[in-house]
């Protein structure tokens, strides 16, 4: 097993401020950049006071967005990272099969999890990855293969909080909304995408936790939100954490016996106070997860929305709603609340929100690129029919 050496890294990685920050620093997503550039140029040149010109820009933007999903990419894949479901002997055996077949191919280096290094022979073509490596040097990997269920895909999303290499998920778990590649045909599937790849950019949310500094000080939260929409630390609040989620962020009452009071703001405008066991804010990808159980609707991943679903709401008039993902949501725990609430990010990293604290949710500039067949729509609908067992007698 060869240990990773920093000297192997590219000497000119992408900076945070570069527009390419939305794409991994690799040849795969660089080929999508011209389409995005065209969209940005049209947006800047369009005279917004002319309705017809604005209509044309909107139409062309939709056309370019569609091209991103159906544009074939000619990848140059030399480095593949494997993420597998832990504690499963069947998955472990299949992982070994994957690794030894991949390193038999020309110019392919495979990265496996460091905890599994004793399972493989030492060779320069097998290296191992750590969480820190994935976080700091995501541009090193040209492709990620996941072996497991949807939980393994979510774990991969947590590994890459910023730029994400293309993800190719193989189904070896209990749920399969995201894992539409058949593990029995892995050789054919991998060889096909090495020649031509289609990538779908799934929306992720950036979630920022803001903690109130002085618990005894009463502040005007409406005024505060309108003045600090993009701020980190403010006079009254401290920024404590930022996480990117693929499925959803959930605010719930935790161990408390009473319902939570949750104030909901849309772009700093007060919408309503939710009296419920909690609130689920989901991406279109997450519409098949907790959001579905909370009464939210299924949503195709191409639709640009934030799905807000109350969990066991006290009022029958409080129903799930869809909000454009161009907006920012603020979830505020009232300053006079009698109890705290808890938040979780894709089911992990539970954090307590005390009265006066709030959470900001907005679309992340780092999407989650999944490899798919030529017809992404068919992939999604087939996964829905298969997993929800529709049309089965």
UniProtKB/Swiss-Prot annotation:
Q: Which GO terms describe its cellular component?
A: cytosol; nucleus
Which key words tag this protein in UniProt?
Cytoplasm, Kinase, NAD, NADP, Nucleus, Transferase
Major location category of this protein = cytoplasm
Please give the positions of the paired cysteines in each disulfide bond: none
Q: Which GO terms describe its biological process?
A: NAD metabolic process; NADP biosynthetic process
Q: Which Gene3D superfamilies match?
A: Probable inorganic polyphosphate/atp-NAD kinase, domain 1, Probable inorganic polyphosphate/atp-NAD kinase, domain 2
Which enzyme class, named as a word? transferase
GO MF, any single term? NADH kinase activity
Segment forming the signal sequence: none
Q: Does the keyword NAD apply?
A: yes
Task: Tell where it localizes.
Answer: Cytoplasm; Nucleus
Q: Which positions, given as ranges, span the membrane?
A: none
Origin: domain of life = Eukaryota
Q: What EC number(s) has UniProt assigned to this enzyme?
A: 2.7.1.-
Q: Which PANTHER family match?
A: KINASE, PUTATIVE (AFU_ORTHOLOGUE AFUA_5G12870)-RELATED (PTHR20275:SF11), NAD KINASE (PTHR20275)
Similarity annotation:
Belongs to the NAD kinase family.
According to UniProt, the name of this protein is: Uncharacterized kinase C3H5.11
Instruction: Name the species this protein comes from.
Output: Schizosaccharomyces pombe (strain 972 / ATCC 24843) (Fission yeast)
